[in-house]
Regions:
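Nucleotide-sugar donor-binding/catalytic module of glycosyltransferases
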Residues: 1-222, 226
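Solvent-exposed aromatic/hydrophobic patches embedded in short alpha-helical segments
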Residues: 156-157, 249-250, 254
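Short, charged, amphipathic alpha-helical segments
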Residues: 239-247, 269
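Inter-helical turn/loop segments and adjacent helix faces that build the functional surface
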Residues: 169-171, 235-239
């Protein structure tokens, strides 16, 4: 939690509505400078099973999650951002489903909350409440798949996935760490399920959210996807997954280029320069196939960027 004083009470109240003797709450205060620390301390004093982890300096969401992982002692781990909340009984429902299915992890629906509007968003899984192979949730390249649902808090993960020191969030990434993590999860785990559960509420449009920033932190999707490409190139099933990785990287570049005028001028210039270099780093044959099969608007934009041509 970092400077979420406006939302901390409702977030922590939702945890109280999920309290159980077998559930521990690890509250990570990432060096907040507003009212967040006081709210967290007051709540933790009243709630058995709650532990406060305090960072002496702001380290970012990746390290905050890693600190929670390292301190966790339960059989399952899940995450909640400081401005979001749970419906009553959500965590117990997740645990019941995992106990019944016996899979490594499960993803869930979530409720997108924009002001007073509520919309249920579902992961693009082929079936619900059945155990599947996570690798089957990555491809094909031209379809929306489970790796396109990067909300790590919309899920629950068995402890053993983290026990070897793996499945930590990349702390060098200030944004897009969730996208890389979800890909690695699907490459590493052996079984998963998509649950018909929608008890986590995602507060959209918060001014302080990392999704709203206009500075260079937005550009961390580039090193995130560079790392992903390296993972896929080392994987035994490179040919199966490389087209999806390249296409998703291209889609992210096109998305950010499309809104570059909203960014700080120096960030927009750096975006165009680094995105061009990223396109030249991609496997050439796979990139050409991607540009051929993408929609014409994005394909033209990416081709112009790669070749150094200006828009007509």
């Amino acid at each position: 939690m970092h400077n979420v004083g406006a939302f901390a009470e409702s977030t922590l109240r939702s945890l109280a509505n999920n309290a159980h003797p077998d559930i521990e709450f690890l509250l990570v205060d990432d060096c907040s400078t507003d009212s967040t620390p006081g709210v967290v301390d007051r709540w933790a004093e009243r709630r058995p099973g709650a532990k406060v982890i305090r960072h002496e300096k702001n380290m970012g969401i990746a390290q905050a999650r890693n600190s929670g992982i390292d301190a966790a002692s339960g059989d399952y781990i899940t995450f909640l951002d400081g401005d979001d909340w749970y419906g009553p009984g959500h965590l117990a429902e997740l645990v019941r489903a995992m106990d019944e299915l016996g899979c490594d992890f499960a993803r869930t629906d979530h409720v997108q909350a924009t002001g007073t509007e509520r919309v249920i968003r579902r992961p693009p899984a082929p079936v619900r409440n059945l155990v599947m192979d996570p690798r089957d949730g990555i491809a094909p390249a031209d379809s929306e798949t489970m790796v396109d649902y990067p909300f790590v808090w919309a899920g629950i993960y068995r402890r053993h996935l983290f026990d070897d020191g793996g499945m930590r969030f990349a702390t060098e990434l200030r944004t897009a760490e969730d996208r890389l993590w979800i890909w690695r999860l699907h490459l590493k785990a052996r079984t998963y399920a998509s649950l018909g559960v929608h008890g986590v509420f995602y507060r959209r449009g918060v001014a302080t959210s990392l999704t709203q920033i206009k500075d260079a932190r937005q550009l961390d999707f580039i090193p995130a996807y560079d790392a992903l490409l390296q993972d896929v190139l080392k994987d035994p099933e490179t040919e199966r997954f490389l087209p999806k990785a390249v296409r998703t990287y291209c889609a992210m570049i096109a998305f950010h280029i499309g809104k570059a005028n909203e960014y700080e001028p120096s960030t927009a210039q750096r975006l165009r320069r680094e995105a061009k270099a990223a396109l030249h780093r991609m496997p050439e044959r796979t990139l050409e196939e991607t540009l051929t099969t993408m929609d014409s608007t994005r394909s033209r934009s990416l081709s112009r960027l790669r070749d150094g041509r200006k828009a007509a």
